[in-house]
Amino acid sequence: MVKQVFEPDTELTAIAIGYKNDKVNYIADKIFPYIPVGEPNFRYNEYPVEEGFSVPDTKVGRISKPNVVEFSAVSKTASVEDYGLDAPVPNYDVTRAPKNYDPRARATEGITDLILLDRELRCAKLARDLNNYAHKETLAEGSRFTDEASDPLRILLEARDKMILGANTLLLGMNVWTALRLHPKIVKATHGNSGDSGAASREAVAELLELSDIIVGKSRHDSAKKGQKAVITPCWEDVCALLYLNNNADNNNGITFGYTARFGNKVAATYFDKDMGLRGAEVIRVGESCKELVVAKECGYAFEDAAAKD
């Protein structure tokens, strides 16, 4: 029986770190990957875009000095936030559990999944906010992916050409991806048929657009208020954005659309509550300290109403 006020548990921490729902559904880690920071309050750099594209005079005279250039960065500050949940496991349940069932592990998995889902929603909110993009476009009636007469391939290619760093990833909500992959012109371009039937694969569309990846958000959450009938809603619905992602970027070097600063690792710990139930309960706590950030708006091009019904 655990009697310490708060005792880290290595076994439960391993579950919290390793536990994943279907990784096809959870995409937050792909768009906003984790980077470690040494303090809860941290600094990160934003780099002036023009410095990477301004061409200085590199010619050097026979006895002259080469021209000097300087590289600057705008240092910004941010703070991680704590996210966590508790799950009580009554001693009564532990003592009566079947041999092949561990209520402590089950509680850890359950709250870990909810924490992941909450992170998914936070990241989807960032991706949906048009203020996080230097480039944005509202697709009017007739140009949306749901309109068979539109030309989504041209729309996406021309948008990518407008981005200073280009794009290597297309981020889509499931409804936008369905509209895109069923669009007659996309089907025709990928299958070489008339386009009146079939569906395009992500690999085929990525090849058409010369992108490294197409990431589709499939996760869902209950959007109803507590106590009301469940309303299961896609987390990434209507999201459509071209992104430049760089997994090697961190808060000091490299440019990427966004990342998640994390202080420390995911943790799981326990404490004993003697006042819970007749025999007390072991309370499982899982959490992390992190902050999701969009750090380079120039690395994104967002489309609004891409899958709206005309």
Over which residues does each language-model region extend?
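A conserved acidic, glycine/proline-rich C-terminal tail/linker
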Residues: G258-F272
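Short, well-structured alpha-helical interface segments that form or flank functional binding sites
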Residues: D102, R106, A200, R279
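Extended oligomerization regions of viral-like shell subunits
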Residues: L165-Y259
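Protruding loop/beta-arch "assembly-hinge" segments enriched in small, turn-prone residues
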Residues: M1-P36, A269-D310
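Intrinsically disordered, low-complexity linear regions
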Residues: V2-Y26, V49, A134-H135, E141, ...
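Alpha-helical scaffold segments that mediate packing/assembly in large oligomeric complexes
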Residues: N91-T169, M174-H191, A308-D310
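Short, hydrophobic/proline-enriched secondary-structure or compact coil segments at domain edges
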Residues: T13-K23, I27, F32, Y44, ...
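Assembly/oligomerization interface modules of large self-assembling protein complexes
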Residues: D22-D86
